Amino acid sequence: MINRRKTRPVYVGNVKIGDGAPIVVQSMTDTKTHDIEATLNQINRLAKAGCEIIRVAVPREEDALALQEIVKNSPIPVIGDIHFSPRIAFLSLESGIHGIRLNPGNINDKGKIKEILQECKKKNIAVRLGVNSGSLEERLLEKYGYPSAEALAESALYWSEFFESVGFTNFKVSIKGSDVLQNIKANKIFAEKTDIPLHIGITEAGPAGRGSIKSAVGIGILLYEGIGDTVRVSLTADPEEEIKVVYQILQALDLRRKGVEIVSCPTCGRIEVNLPEVVKKVEEKLEAVDKPLKVAIMGCVVNAIGEAKEADIGLACGNKSAILFKKGVPIKRVSEEEMVEELLNEIQRMDNE
């Protein structure tokens, strides 16, 4: 079992972050926020996929003015992503928004930040203090020569202390870069010095394939070491893909379970069925199942018996047929043509139990 870092609680709307709460899954819309209908449609799809907090870009006044309607109709808490403009921040705070993200790399006027924090405190609005390698303060770039892990951690600690010095504690921190090792080190430095909750992720990770791998490595290592209270996988892809990858990472570390986990062998010369096709069909059909189930689909008997004992249900394939098993007990033999349908029917019954 992973021993998670002890952190203080932060609330974004009704969602608790830190203090032992389950790791919260986040994403960000890719719509124009002032297009209220498109933004709400995407938020609803993401919420259905398992997103628990959503962030929206607020680059212009028209986006800030759209927030009230979005917040009112969103099924999950909404965070406004604010850069450069304190005025946009204040407009956003009037919308009833649940949280805002501030980047000290591009809003570093302490007077304005203090005013924003005071308004957040008055309205009970949470803040994410977001430090990013691509927008680090000039003084730290001059000190370290580049956005090193130490520079990122120093920025996060400096601004955290400033937030607390003006009496604001309802915030979490994110320290992100696209370099996995830099990201891990920066978050570890910060985590050792404070109990502030951390939002973790690899920013600008890239397209779905490469980005998922980078995210799994970077996020997975931090989570294994107990660091991270909320997480986003950032991909150049449909945001719904981000949600799938997040839950797969959390499931692999036994931190949260949602939906079906498929265990299948890599295939070899012993298999006598088209296992890749079987697995593909099963995976596609089970995307909508939310119940945590472990499904084993094995190509031969070598590991099938052992996996059957660990899985909720599965197939042990042989010569153009398979044994369907449930909780390690063989149920019946099915033909290659029937195996997918029989397995799916049994899983549907389990999902309804």
Swiss-Prot record:
It comes from the Bacteria. It catalyses: (2E)-4-hydroxy-3-methylbut-2-enyl diphosphate + oxidized [flavodoxin] + H2O + 2 H(+) = 2-C-methyl-D-erythritol 2,4-cyclic diphosphate + reduced [flavodoxin]. Its EC number is 1.17.7.3. Pathway: Isoprenoid biosynthesis; isopentenyl diphosphate biosynthesis via DXP pathway; isopentenyl diphosphate from 1-deoxy-D-xylulose 5-phosphate: step 5/6. InterPro entries: Dihydropteroate_synth-like_sf (IPR011005), Enolase-like_C_sf (IPR036849), IspG_bac (IPR016425), IspG_bac-typ (IPR004588), NO2/SO3_Rdtase_4Fe4S_sf (IPR045854). Its cofactor is [4Fe-4S] cluster. Binds 1 [4Fe-4S] cluster. Keywords: 4Fe-4S, Iron, Iron-sulfur, Isoprene biosynthesis, Metal-binding, Oxidoreductase. One of its GO terms (molecular function) is 4-hydroxy-3-methylbut-2-en-1-yl diphosphate synthase activity (ferredoxin). Pfam families: GcpE. Converts 2C-methyl-D-erythritol 2,4-cyclodiphosphate (ME-2,4cPP) into 1-hydroxy-2-methyl-2-(E)-butenyl 4-diphosphate. PANTHER family: 4-HYDROXY-3-METHYLBUT-2-EN-1-YL DIPHOSPHATE SYNTHASE (PTHR30454), 4-HYDROXY-3-METHYLBUT-2-EN-1-YL DIPHOSPHATE SYNTHASE (FERREDOXIN), CHLOROPLASTIC (PTHR30454:SF0). Belongs to the IspG family. HAMAP family: IspG. This is 4-hydroxy-3-methylbut-2-en-1-yl diphosphate synthase (flavodoxin). It comes from Sulfurihydrogenibium sp. (strain YO3AOP1).
